Structures are given as C-alpha cells and as structure tokens.
Amino acid sequence: MSVEKNTRQLEKDIVRDFSSRMSYASYLQLPTLLSAQQPVSNPEHHDEMLFIIQHQTTELWLKLVLHELRSAAAWLRSDDLGSALKAIARVKHIQKTLTEQWSVLATLTPTEYSQFRRFLGNSSGFQSSQYRAVEFVLGNKNRKMLPVFESDPEAYQQLSNVLEAPSIYDEFLAYLNRQGFDIPTSLLERDVTKAHQFCPELVPVFKHIYENAADNWGAYEACEELVDLEDNFQLWRFRHLRTVQRTIGMKAGTGGSSGAAFLQKALELTFFPELFAVRTEIGQ
C-alpha cells in the first residue's frame, strides 16, 4: 500500500485557522495543564513522571466526584431523587476508574520508587483536601483532620464548609422522612459535623423498604446505589493499601503516618452501616 493511499485527507470544511477561534488546547487550557508536571528529583528520575501524573489525574477525578456528590445532595434536598441517582451513578463509574488506576502505579517497583522518594519531603496523599472532602461528603467527618490544611486557607475553608454541611446520607435520610418513612428524630437532628454512628432504630426502616421494594422502588434503588458507593470506596481503599504494601512494604509514610498500617485502619470505617446491617434482618 502506498503512503498516499494510507493517508486520510482533510475534509474541506475542517477548521484550520484558530487565530481568532477557540481551539481544543485553549478550551482545555492544555498549556497550563501539561506544564504542571514538574519532577523534583535530581537528577530527574524517569518514573517520577508516572508518580506525578497518577496523583494529578486522581485529583481531577476527585474534583468531578465532589461536583457530582454536591449536586446529588442538592437534588435530594429538593426531592429530585432521579437526578440525584443519576449523579451517583456517574460517581460509581469514576470510582471504578480510580480503582483500576492503581494498576498503573503498581508498575512502579520498590527499587524505582526508592530512588526518588526522598525528594518528596513530607508531601503525602493524606494531605489531599479533595479526598478528605469526599470522605466528609459521604459522612466520615473528623474535625481533627482540619489542622493538616491550615497552611492552605482555600482548602481549609472548603473542608470547613463540607464539615458543617449535611452528608449525602443525612440528606437521604431527610428525604426519606419527607416521603413518610419513620426516620429516628435523633438522626434528623444530629450534629452533622460528626461522623455518622450506627443507629439500630434505622434498620427496621430499611428492612421495610427492602422487603417491600415494589412499593418503595425509588427508596430501594437509592439504598442500593449508596451500597454501591461504599463498596466502590472500600475497593479503592484496598487497592491503595495493596499498592503501598507492594511498593514500600511497611515503611512509614512520607507524611508521618505508619504507612500501610494506617491505611489498613481505614478499611474499618463505614459510611452507611445500617444499609449493610439490614441484610442480616431481611427475610427474618
């Protein structure tokens, strides 16, 4: 086959002059985006680019997760369950992408990482304000996390705002209450700046929804969507843990944590405990 025959000709109407038009690069601000990868190792280590891009893309996805979860919470407040579930469905797909993304970083061997890790100083994923905001939005509130971000006023304010706002679970329970379900008053009037604690009185409410799904389909579907969210989050946490274990073993984290041991404890945290507890009660 000749080169000429293996070439796609540009159609005559394809725009070529962008001197006064918005282009792909200008719309996405690619010069800014693609200049943000600045390795600090000296001499520059080949694999640091992977490390930087892995974390930068994670931050972009987390930005979208927050965008969708905030919208979902707002739609729940206005009783628009359909729109809320649509946003949550999108978040679930993002979560799967984030989880699979660990497989790329896992190609970084312990030897390779050790050759530039010392240049990272005390920077650590633990300091990701967006990750912390996602945990807060899902209900894992912890005011003691805020001091980590005092040197970044914008991030500190963002997290403070999320801490003070109801979580998506709080909004869902308030929605159910407005729909006539008997949600315990203690949950409707709780201090939303604190992590949700297991409430046994809520389990019978979910039991009724699950055992009468046909009559409560919207609530039933929402319950399952939230279960998916937590499952996906736990899978992400697990892949994070395993990637750390295979890369640095049981070394302490760059930010001062115990490393893998600290990540292991995160697997014990839960967002929607009653939605898992009800499974024991269904059919009994």
From Swiss-Prot:
Binds 1 heme group per subunit. It catalyses: L-tryptophan + O2 = N-formyl-L-kynurenine. Substrate binds at F51, I52, I53, Q54, H55, Y113, R117, T254. Its cofactor is heme. Pfam families: Trp_dioxygenase. Transmembrane segments: none annotated. Pathway: Amino-acid degradation; L-tryptophan degradation via kynurenine pathway; L-kynurenine from L-tryptophan: step 1/2. One of its GO terms (molecular function) is metal ion binding. Its EC number is 1.13.11.11. Heme binds at H240. GO terms for biological process: L-tryptophan catabolic process to acetyl-CoA; L-tryptophan catabolic process to kynurenine. The keyword Heme applies. It is an enzyme of class 1 (oxidoreductase). Keywords: Dioxygenase, Heme, Iron, Metal-binding, Oxidoreductase, Tryptophan catabolism. The keyword Metal-binding applies. Heme-dependent dioxygenase that catalyzes the oxidative cleavage of the L-tryptophan (L-Trp) pyrrole ring and converts L-tryptophan to N-formyl-L-kynurenine. Catalyzes the oxidative cleavage of the indole moiety. Belongs to the tryptophan 2,3-dioxygenase family. Homotetramer. This is Tryptophan 2,3-dioxygenase. The gene is kynA.
